[in-house]
Amino acid sequence: MLRRSPTLLRVSPFSLYMKDLAKNGTLQNDRNPAKTASRLYRKLSEPEKMALQKRAARVSYPALDAYNRFQKEYAHRFLHLSNKKRQREVSKLWAELKKNGTVKVPKAPKAAKSASSKVKTAAKTAKKTTAARK
């Protein structure tokens, strides 16, 4: 069974490679650009593929992220519908609100602080309290 993971939902290295080929003009006037791109992609060396994977991991689509947050926020309103119909209703709502200019997208959650920064702040407050006691 396929599982859903953030890695699978991101941009694929192959799609980035196809974009690069399209920018270079390699795929211009080609009857089957996907076939040509896949043949060239398979010929890439391992370091080149790893570089593409690293680039793909960094790429995100802000508009898609905003829609996903909106969908997460509003999907619970349509729990009485099947999943497919729920997705349609949320997308209709998104389109309608976007057309009116009244889309309220929830903000992205802030990145959690690292454990080391928490330890440092705790140590600083401990120093301050001990210094204040003296």
From Swiss-Prot:
Belongs to the KAP family. Histone H1-like DNA-binding protein involved in the organization and segregation of kinetoplast DNA (kDNA). The mitochondrial DNA of kinetoplastid protozoa consists of about 5,000 minicircles and 20 to 30 maxicircles. These circular DNAs are held together by catenation into a highly organized compact disk structure referred to as a kinetoplast DNA (kDNA) network. Binds preferentially to a specific fragment of minicircle DNA and is able to compact kDNA networks through DNA charge neutralization and condensation. PANTHER family: DNA-ASSOCIATED PROTEIN, PUTATIVE-RELATED (PTHR37564:SF4), KINETOPLAST DNA-ASSOCIATED PROTEIN (PTHR37564). Residues 1-10 form a propeptide. Residues 106-124 have a biased composition (Low complexity). This is kinetoplast-associated protein 3. Disulfide bonds: none annotated. Associates with the kinetoplast DNA network. Keywords: DNA-binding, Kinetoplast, Mitochondrion. Residues 106-134 are annotated as: Disordered. Residues 125-134 have a biased composition (Basic residues). GO terms for molecular function: DNA binding. The keyword Transcription does not apply. It comes from Crithidia fasciculata. It is found in: Mitochondrion matrix, Kinetoplast. GO terms for cellular component: kinetoplast. The keyword Ribosomal protein does not apply. Induction: Expression varies periodically during the cell cycle in the same manner as transcripts of several kinetoplast and nuclear DNA replication genes.
